[in-house]
Amino acid sequence: MIEIDITKDMIGQCEAKAKDIGRLRNSITKGKGNLAGIVGEYVTHQHLKGSEWQNTYDYDLIENNKKIDVKTKRCSSKPRDNYDCSVAETSLHQDCDEYIFVRILNDLSKAWILGRMGRDAFFKKAKHMKKGQVDKSNNFKVHANCYNLTIKELNTL
C-alpha cells in the first residue's frame, strides 16, 4: 500500500477535469465522487512513471500497452488490508486489461494506492455481492451490485 499526501496544487489540476466529466452514467455516487476519482487517477499516473493518462470510457491509463482502469473509493480513515476493493456490475462492459485500486480520504488530504490485478484474475477471485447485501467479513452493506476482493489479495505496484 502506497500512501500519498495530496496537495492543493494536485486538487487544482484535477478540478476542471472532474467538472468536465459531469455525472457519469451508471455512477454509484451519481457524480459526487468525480473529483476523488480524478485525483485517484492522477496520483496513480504520477506513481506509474511511464504511464499515459487517457481517461476514456473504458480505461484511465496505459502502461506497457496495458489498459488500466483506476477504481477509487472515498474513505474516512486509513484502509485496512481486509477492506474490499470493488468493481460495480455496471462497469463490466469496460474494455480494460487491469484494475488499480485507490482509497482517498473524504477531505482529499491523503490517498493510498492499494494494489493492482488483471481483469480476468480479479473476476476469478472476486466475490459477487448484490445491492443491500451485508458482507459478513467486514459488516459493510453493499450500495450496488458489485464484485469485491480484499486489499490483501491484490498484487503490489
Where are the model-predicted features located?
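Nucleic-acid endonuclease domains
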Residues: 1-66, 71-157
